[in-house]
Amino acid sequence: MLLYRAGHRALKRLRRDGLRPEDVRVLVGPASGPKWLIFPGVDRVLMEKGFGVPRNGGGHRLLVGSSAGAWRMLAFAARRPLEAYERLIDGYVSQTFPMPVRAKDVTPAYRRMLAEVFTDDDLDAITSHPHADVAIHVTRVFDPYPWSYRAAQIAAIAMGMAVHRLWTG
C-alpha cells in the first residue's frame, strides 16, 4: 500500500489519473546502509514503469542520493538500469570485510565494486543524459575534538530543521 500525501488538487488528480512518470520531477535515494536491500522490488517496478530517467523526452528528472541511495540513483540513470541494478545488488551482498571493519578496508572495496557495477556506457548515460541529472550528496567529517562531535551533530540537525521549516512554511 502506498500512502499519498498531497494537497486537495493533487490528490484529486492522483485519484483520477494515478501516479504517472511525468508527474515525478525528483526521485530521492536516502542513505540507508544495508536497509536499501528492502527496495529492489519497488525500484524494479519504478524502472520498468518509467519513473527513473526519462528515456524518450517526458520532462526532466533529478535523481538525488547519498551513500547507498546514490548508488541506487546511479543505477536508475545507467544505460540499462535493471542490469546495472542487479549488478549493484550482487556486488553489495557479496562484500566481505575483515574484523574489525575499518574505513581503510571498506572504501577501496566499494570503489572496486562500483567500478565493476557501472560500465563505461553507464557512466556516459549518467553524465550526459539530456533529460536527467544525478546529484550525489557526500559529507566527510574530520573531528579533531571528539568532545565536540555531539555539539556539531546537534547544531547540524537544528540547522536542517530550520531550513526545512523555512522551505515548507
Annotated model-derived regions:
Residues 1-62, 74-169:
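Patatin-like phospholipase
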